[in-house]
């Protein structure tokens, strides 16, 4: 997952850095941690690892939304993930996840992904009704919470259980 990918140049650089040849320029050896450091034919190995690697580029600014079609058209990109909190902040509408500008941004990214056979993703929206609305529109890579929110939910359950024992 790569944050703040605003343009084609940055997107291409991320593909180059994250993918093995022929898609990128990541260094290759015959034994990698992805295959338990066993020796493999590197020609086949690079293809297998490239196909098993998910490259997610975050769309978090109006510029990135404007460039979504071009970014989605880059070979080696799998998901365009809208970072909704950051996008709202950049647009000057903090927390307004159902604002027309955000809905339009979602539609733009979804259309770009559908056109190029990529997956549209969303993060930062955890209201079930809004999530359902955006999933219905075409979001397919869904962040349904954050590490911190999941840990805090578990901690609250544990704290309540302990308080019940006291």
For each predicted feature, which ranges?
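Hydrophobic faces of well-ordered beta-strands that scaffold small-molecule active sites
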Residues: 1-2, 55-60, 80-82, 120-123, ...
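Alpha-helix N-cap and loop-to-helix initiation/capping positions
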Residues: 6, 97-104
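Glycine-rich, proline-tolerant flexible connector loops at the mouths of alpha/beta enzymes
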Residues: 82-100
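Conserved anion-binding
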Residues: 2-75, 86-89
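C-terminal helical cap(s) of enzyme catalytic domains, especially alpha/beta-barrels
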Residues: 8-24, 148-166
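Short beta-strand/loop segments at the ligand-binding rim of alpha/beta enzyme cores
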Residues: 47-60, 108-122
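Glycine-enriched alpha-helix->loop->beta-strand junction motifs that scaffold or abut catalytic
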Residues: 19-20, 74-79, 136-142
